[in-house]
Amino acid sequence: MTHLNAFSSVEHSTVLLHETVDGLALKENGIYIDGTFGRGGHSRLILSKLSANGKLIAIDRDPKAVAEAQKIQDPRFQIEHNTFSEILSICEKRGLVGKIDGILLDLGVSSPQLDDAARGFSFMKDGPLDMRMDDSKGISAAEWLQQVSEQDLAWVLKTFGEERFAKKIAKAIVNYNKSAVQNGSEFLTRTLQLAELIAHTVPFKDKHKHPATRSFQAIRIFINAELDELEKVLQSALTVLAPAGRLSVISFHSLEDRMVKHFMRKQSQGREIPKGLPLREDQIQRNQTLKVIGKAIMPTDAEIAQNPRARSAVLRVAERLN
């Protein structure tokens, strides 16, 4: 059963599309989860490889992504409006714990989210300073910046953006909003306002990287609790995957990739055994839960030339052990 035409329109923009799906080692009758539907590039390719008995559950917290997924009329496909950290409860209500043959995660912000100025993710387009992946929940970036302390903001910029000018930028943002209160002027509410403030605050040395890049990343990660969500889904994957089930994860910045790499490595090594114990190798129960499959995969030069956003992508794959 093929659906090649269904995904051809998004194939060009989905990073490491075939490599990520290949990492799942698809079984045509298997049960799979696409934890980040986005605009459906991975989901449509997975469906094209499944038989009539296969199943795919997609998850996305973005209402626009869910609306896109609802256009897929396929009895093998279901969409969940949720965060992927809830993967365990999603499987529990379907009786699928320990029965999932593969989980795919394409982390970070999607191209449609970046390209839509109204979402507030981009420092290149003017829009409301929102940055929520699900704009029906939580507070916007603008609202948070109006109430955060200089110290806490600096911590977020440093921790989630690895921004070396974190203190300087935090001071400028907090002072801007304080003066808005005193003068009765407008708070930071627009993306370009924030981007320009940062550009005027720090040295602009790297021609290829906007000075607001790291700050926007840090604020977005914090607003959406992205690293907390990632930690939860990785742990839950161990419970919901079937033996030999695959976990295929694309990350786009070093914080995500370090978390994924460390998790897979730790689970593949199992628990440490103190040196000097009088045990034979066959007596040692290390309790490894994953096997790392191959080395990390990066996009080719050709893919990066076609889609510059692929530049920082890293794909890692692991397999659930019995």
Curated annotation (Swiss-Prot):
GO CC aspect terms: cytoplasm
Organism: Aggregatibacter aphrophilus (strain NJ8700)
Gene name of the encoded protein: rsmH
Location(s) in or outside the cell: Cytoplasm
Residues annotated to bind S-adenosyl-L-methionine: G40, G41, H42, D60, F84, D106, Q113
Record function comment: Specifically methylates the N4 position of cytidine in position 1402 (C1402) of 16S rRNA.
Gene Ontology terms: biological process: rRNA base methylation
Protein name according to UniProt: Ribosomal RNA small subunit methyltransferase H
Pfam families: Methyltransf_5 (PF01795)
Single GO MF descriptor: rRNA (cytosine-N4-)-methyltransferase activity
Keyword flag S-adenosyl-L-methionine: yes
Domain of life: Bacteria
Record's keyword terms, sorted: Cytoplasm, Methyltransferase, rRNA processing, S-adenosyl-L-methionine, Transferase
Keyword Methyltransferase listed: yes
